Amino acid sequence: MATANPGRGGGRRGGGAMDDDKLVFETTDGIEPITSFNDMGIKEDVLRGVYEYGFEKPSAIQQRAVMPILQGRDVIAQAQSGTGKTSMIALSVCQVVDTSSREVQALILSPTRELATQTEKTIQAIGLHANIQAHACIGGNSVGEDIRKLEHGVHVVSGTPGRVCDMIKRRSLRTRAIKLLILDESDEMLSRGFKDQIYDVYRYLPPDLQVCLVSATLPHEILEMTSKFMTEPVKILVKRDELTLEGIKQFFVAVEKEEWKFDTLCDLYDTLTITQAVIFCNTKRKVDYLSEKMRSHNFTVSSMHGDMPQKERDAIMNEFRSGDSRVLITTDVWARGIDVQQVSLVINYDLPNNRELYIHRIGRSGRFGRKGVAINFVKSDDIKILRDIEQYYSTQIDEMPMNVADLI
């Protein structure tokens, strides 16, 4: 169990799992995969929620991570995007919660509002018959509503670090009964600006806390940091050279100038029949620029970035999930963990600034083993970044063939 705490002294409906034979795990000795939900000792009402949610068989990461979490161990769980990480979190949380108490017993921190909200919804779905109450504490929503919900009593809080910390300091979120902390997408949370906020939250948590880190990528420096707040963690790791998702075909298109990217995008539209696509840009300004330009050329697109009010972001996400909108232009606020089943194509209009974001972006195009295509627009000064991504993931990104339409 954790913790030396310096302040005191992280799936889907539709059933299938990825082809586990293709995944290579570096896992703590003694961790045996459990291939059936029925063999996990899960409460019947939670199990009913799991099956109703659409799972038939645990995915690779669920087979290995759920039992150590339920046994109270600290866990570092690494799984590719789309392997059922969110559902693994929800299942574990629903099993450990004692519904006879109205106090918060599990806290999940996520880097984006959308991921925190999706986690909350998954917990509510899987925990429906167990009457598990979850609430998303996220910036952009009403503070008053957060206070009201928390004071009424919930079992699980899924939130972003800033708002969660605020609720703790206001004493609306009482931490004395929290026994499980989960850091979802912990690479993003710890390696960027969230580290201080996480430690702020930590200071208020009980000393016998159980800690889990869940992420698609776990760079060496992140694993080093875990020694500060985890005790003998069970490690469930995918080797890095297996991290590019199975079934994702990756290509690049060489564009000499920035201005040529738009024409290239229009040519792609003419060539392809797009079910649903996500187009990633590196800046909010570029998202706005590209969205306006696409609309002026009579393309129907949605767009989203972090400056938009939360209600607007929610409406856009719902529109895209339901299929009413087929093309979403966005920044990396969307790249982590958002589950949309029909996405068949991801276009990196800009290559990501951070190579570790690459897998989060292209992971959208083949969730749970679905096939997908990722196309990267590459200027001459981007070649080095592209090669760096290839080397980092031990993968090959070829020039886009003429028959790309046959691959989507």
Swiss-Prot record:
Coiled coil: none annotated. ATP binds at residues 79-86. Induction: Induced by cold and heat stresses. Disruption phenotype: No visible phenotype under normal growth conditions, but mutant seedlings show increased sensitivity to cold and heat stresses. Phosphorylated at Ser-100 and Ser-101. Phosphorylation status of Ser-100 and Ser-101 largely determines the subcellular localization of EIF4A3. It catalyses: ATP + H2O = ADP + phosphate + H(+). InterPro entries: DEAD/DEAH_box_helicase_dom (IPR011545), Helicase_ATP-bd (IPR014001), Helicase_C-like (IPR001650), P-loop_NTPase (IPR027417), RNA_helicase_DEAD_Q_motif (IPR014014). Its EC number is 3.6.4.13. Residues 7-17 have a biased composition (Gly residues). The keyword Nucleus applies. It is an enzyme of class 3 (hydrolase). Residues 1-20 are annotated as: Disordered. A motif (Q motif) lies at residues 35-63. The modification Phosphoserine is found at residues 100-101. GO terms for molecular function: ATP binding; ATP hydrolysis activity; mRNA binding; RNA helicase activity. ATP-dependent RNA helicase. Core component of the splicing-dependent multiprotein exon junction complex (EJC) deposited at splice junctions on mRNAs. The EJC is a dynamic structure consisting of core proteins and several peripheral nuclear and cytoplasmic associated factors that join the complex only transiently either during EJC assembly or during subsequent mRNA metabolism. The Q motif is unique to and characteristic of the DEAD box family of RNA helicases and controls ATP binding and hydrolysis. PANTHER family: ATP-DEPENDENT RNA HELICASE DBP3. This is Eukaryotic initiation factor 4A-III homolog. It comes from Arabidopsis thaliana (Mouse-ear cress).
